[in-house]
Amino acid sequence: MRNVSYRIFLFVLIFSPLAFGARDPLALAILEWSCVFGAVFYLLALKGNATPYRVPGLLPLGLFVGWLVFQAVPLPATLVKWVSPATYLIYRENLGPLEEFSWIPLSVYPGKTLAEGFRFSAYLLFYWGTVQLLSDRDKLKKTVLVVAGLAGVMAVYAIVETLFTNGKIYGFYAGPANNTHVGPYVYHNHYSGFMGMILPMVLGLYLYYRPQARYGSWRERVVEFWSGAAGHLHLLLGFAAVLMGTSVFLSLSRGGVISLCLSMICLVGFFSLRKGTSRRKRFVSLSVLLILLSVSWFGWEPIVERFGRAFNEEGKFVNSRFTIWNDAYGMVNDFFLTGTGVGTFEAIYPGYRSLQGQKSVGHAHNDYIELLSCGGVIGCLLVVWFVVALFRATWAMYRKRRDPYAHCLYLGSFTGILAICFHSVVDFNFYSNANGLVFFFMCGLAVAASHTRLRGRQETFLADSTPVHKRVTWVFTVVFLLLVGVYQGGSLRASALFDRVDGTVVSGDTTLQESSQVIETLHWAAFFAPLEPAYPFALAQVFAVYGEGDMAKGWLTQALRLCPVDSSVLQYTARYASRRNRKVLGRHYFERAVAHDAANPDRRKMFAGWLLGAGETDEASLHLKQAMLLDVSKDNIKACISLLLYHGLSKETIYGMLPERIYPRFVFADTMSAFGHGELAREAILRAMDYLECDDSLRPWHFMKIYRVYMTEKDYDMALSVLQRASEYFPGHPKIRLLTGDTYLKMGIPYRAAEEYEQVLIVDPDNRRATAGLKRLSSYL
């Protein structure tokens, strides 16, 4: 049974990173089931009165898992109001108008929080199993070599993929859009996080297996080195370490590169603390040098360019992470004690978002900030307790050990833990399913390296646990097995059912048979995954189409009960209430939808349309103006202008509502031109010059559009003045200089035109238009 448990242990350790980082729901389910079955088989191997070993930090880790479950289960509303007033307010404002409630959870998305509880329960069992299994010295040595080999193979694949790739993982999986995949990972930062944990361990093994050939001639030393198995393994581990470090640099993960460098400094420092390790310190430094030389062979230009993107034209360090972290401060302030529920960042963040753009933000890109905002102070303290307990138990034992293998392996594993902790300052590695598993493997490895005895009859310095601990472990494992089987099995089944009808358009023209099939499928999906709000929301939309108002309301209530901060559901509820002539309720839910997704222009446009229909033009104007500021794309601005025109607002009024930027004026002009108002379009374009000082997103073509209007009217003086203003903002821009030369030529000032053409050729020597212009002017000069 113990061998079966060990095989499962190795399987999940290898499978998770190779399965695209175990990001797919099926891969996560396999990970969780493997962890629990591995624990079951190990417990079955403990016959009679035999008990497992005590595991450092298991109590705080178990309490952390319990805290996640506690966040997800319904509690008396009065208790929630007392410990988390902000959570109570959300449920009161978003769910209260539809139904009275007396029990609510601390989490604003209990389904996500419970899923995180299951994930960390699997990690807990895996950590426990790692400590138990690696107390066997043979399994310990075998496991670390298997992991080193896995990381080496992944590094080779990542490097080859970087050089010869079709843009897909394994040649067939494209991964999600807007992500840069490296190796088998869909996100390059997660790949570098994985390698950052494993590389120090591999270097530790590399140092341990260094052949001890200190006497004899150089020839004898070389022969002894190549004839021994240790010498071969030493070279293989060193080669793997160089490949792994090189692949981190080639991944272009800035956080990964920085954390790798910091971890190497720490590893050298740790070896410096022990006497007689100066040679090992030199070997680590040599490995780092070889990594840098290897990167030089591939070229530093992409890496330098990647780091250069972190600075703007003025040399200031800019990154959207800073904005997200600043926004998260508001979340921490509102949910300081209990958090919003671990795993709910993506759901709650839109209500605090000030980040420009419409790109979805799923995580804080800082695991510590996300833990504090979603897990609260209670969750943070439990995590700190676990880390302190782990460090105290392992460091104290490491200091007592005299075995070089224990020293090298412990320092390598401990440095790997530090590497992921460094990286987590700027990324969300603990929300990578595979990296979370590997982190707890490294924790278990640190315990095993410091406690497992490599000689003698006694396996480990770990103490045996009591029979009570064994029974508690059995109960936890069996309960988790049942719950995760039901939860993951139901989630996978519900997802498969939903995929059958996802994208199906249900309307009044849909046949009864088709609509009945859709409703039945969604009912089953909601049955198999009762904590997923997407299925009740879909049912509410279907019933609303067929005028089943009470059924639609019931399913909307259920969706809000499961996630009261979903702005899509809140907005649909507002529309539902408005159609039933409940204007006060409709307005309330429109306001809640905007409040929980303030940076989404679509929420504001929908609310503004409702306000315009109700005759509340002033408030609608404010929302539309904000919507245009949030998204300055042509489609969005045109949609806002069209909405105002549809509701009968005058063109002058609409122009006055535009944001104080240039581009919205151009879109307004294009819209007016399409409706045949050419003079109004001309005026809008020319008046855009009044907003130069207000616009921080000026582009050269903004000036050129105004310039063309004057050139069409043959007003060369005004056209020239526009180009001169453009040169103040974009000095040396070849296109602006070229147009300036053309304008001077039309004005009959050839020598000034020649000067401008010459300036163009200084910046762009191959510019054909400037060269041709100078040739034409040669007869005049």
Please state what every model-predicted region is.
Residues Y352, G357-K359, G490-L680, S697, ...:
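Soluble catalytic regions of membrane-associated enzymes that act on cell-envelope
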